Swiss-Prot record:
Keywords: Acetylcholine receptor inhibiting toxin, Disulfide bond, Ion channel impairing toxin, Neurotoxin, Postsynaptic neurotoxin, Secreted, Signal, Toxin
Organism, as annotated: Naja sputatrix (Malayan spitting cobra)
Subcellular location per the Swiss-Prot or TrEMBL entry: Secreted
Keyword Ligase: no
Protein name stated in the entry: Weak neurotoxin 8
GO molecular function, one term: toxin activity
Amino acid sequence: MKTLLLTLVVVTIVCLDLGYTLTCLNCPEMFCGKFQTCRNGEKICFKMLQQRRPFSLRYIRGCAATCPGTKPRDMVECCSTDRCNR
């Protein structure tokens, strides 16, 4: 009986989604060391480079539910593993 109960507990733990959360870099600088744990539903890390005017660049990194769209002259890279948006 104890073996059956233990087996059921193990199967339940394995089959349940234990709430894995993604970790992404989150900062506006080119060189970044600040991480954030993404919220539920955010399964994408992104790195965006925005060109505001000639020789003026803005870096944005963070979590998202989907890969963000860009404007002309902007670049975005998306990935789905921990700390992949370096």
